[in-house]
Every structure is written in structure tokens, then in C-alpha cells.
């Protein structure tokens, strides 16, 4: 079983700790309107968990909590997951199943490589995504629909502006993943969990190398 990077508990904690060991200037880059839209979404999620304010604070305390003392990408992903109330990860679930089945798990990138990629995400892309927080619910619904339909091209088009869809995150990493996958797949009885943005590039490299690649949908 191949995964993009290490997914064990210790590695996940190191990523979280690293994300908490930085700063950002997101509050100064975002308009007050954008900040309050995010604050409203965060408060709505908190209200659903029974944390309703009798008299709501006049300052964006949730936004401040999520953006204080963390790296830009850590702030974004924390806000994104909280606003959408989406704690799931297909990669992590695949890893857990593989461990339970006692399968050999291979990380295609080191933790250090993955952290470097996260730090390289342009802040401008993060700001742009946060500016569009009002449309996140619609984005999530469209994403799920396209995913369930197996519409890869539709997903690529929908998510082209997402923070991790730039050339820094894709591109070179596709080649790296292909090089790790190839000998493992040649040996047989293998599966790889990768983010869908990598699928076009990786499958292209496999086809160029003479492999037959077929999309299978339920």
C-alpha cells in the first residue's frame, strides 16, 4: 500500500506541531468582510455543537483562534475543516485499513518533503480561497457529486483554484510518485492512495512508459 506521505500518529502530530510553530499575516491580507464571513461560519458550526453565545462577542474570536501563532497553510486547513465540519481523510482511512490487514505501507515522500511543499503554497492562493468562504458549502456539494460520478475532468475544473492545485504542489511530485509506484506495481498486488490532482499526471507517465491505464467506476 502506497501513500503520498507518512500517515502514522507520530507523523501526524509532527505535522500539527510544525503547523503551530509559525506566524502569518492573513488578518492584514483579508478584508473585514471576508474575516466576518469566516467567523460567521465558524460560529455556526460551534452553535451546532451547543456552544451558542447568549451575547456574541464583537470581535472575531474564532477567526483569531484559528489564525494566531500558526503557519498560513495550517490556518487555512484548520478553518476549512472546521467550517465544512469534515474530519475525514480517504488517505488516512486507507492507511488504517492497511495497518489492520498487516499490509506493508510505503510513503512515497518523506515528512520533510511534504512540509516543504506546504510551506511553498503561495499565500496569495490561501487568501483567495479564504476570500471565497461563502461559497465553500456549494463547492463541497459539487465536489462530492462529481467524485461519486467519477468525473475526474469535472473535479479538476471545479478545484483548479484550490490552494493545493498549483504547480508547486503538483508537477514534480507526480514524477516522484510515479518513480516510487512503478517497481511496486510491477511486483503486483499493490494499491496507491493519491490526491486526485495527481491522477492525470501520474497516469500519463504510466501510459508513456507503456502501461495500460483504465478508470473503473462503480
Q: Where are the model-predicted features located?
A:
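Structured, acidic catalytic/metal-binding patches in enzyme active sites
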Residues: 1-165
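A cross-kingdom marker for long, charged
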Residues: 163-218
Amino acid at each position: 500500500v502506497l501513500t503520498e506521505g507518512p500517515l502514522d500518529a507520530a507523523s501526524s502530530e509532527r505535522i500539527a506541531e510544525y503547523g503551530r510553530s509559525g506566524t502569518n499575516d492573513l488578518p492584514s491580507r483579508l478584508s473585514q468582510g471576508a474575516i466576518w464571513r469566516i467567523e460567521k461560519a465558524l460560529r455556526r458550526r460551534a452553535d451546532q455543537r451547543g456552544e451558542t453565545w447568549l451575547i456574541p462577542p464583537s470581535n472575531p474570536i474564532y477567526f483569531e483562534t484559528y489564525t494566531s501563532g500558526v503557519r498560513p497553510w495550517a490556518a487555512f486547513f484548520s478553518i476549512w475543516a472546521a467550517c465544512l465540519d469534515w474530519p475525514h481523510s480517504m488517505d488516512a482511512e486507507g492507511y488504517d485499513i492497511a495497518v489492520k490487514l498487516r499490509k506493508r505501507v510505503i510513503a512515497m515522500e518523506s515528512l520533510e518533503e511534504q512540509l516543504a511543499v506546504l510551506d511553498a503554497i503561495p499565500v496569495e492562493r490561501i487568501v483567495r480561497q479564504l476570500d471565497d468562504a461563502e461559497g465553500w458549502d456549494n463547492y463541497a456539494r459539487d465536489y462530492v457529486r462529481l467524485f461519486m460520478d467519477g468525473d475526474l475532468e469535472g473535479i479538476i475544473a471545479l478545484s483548479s483554484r484550490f490552494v493545493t492545485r498549483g504547480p508547486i504542489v503538483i508537477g514534480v511530485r507526480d514524477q516522484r510518485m510515479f518513480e516510487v509506484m512503478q517497481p511496486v506495481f510491477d511486483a503486483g498486488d499493490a494499491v496507491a492512495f493519491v490526491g486526485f490532482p495527481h491522477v492525470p499526471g501520474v497516469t500519463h507517465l504510466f501510459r508513456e512508459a507503456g502501461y495500460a491505464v483504465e478508470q473503473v467506476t462503480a
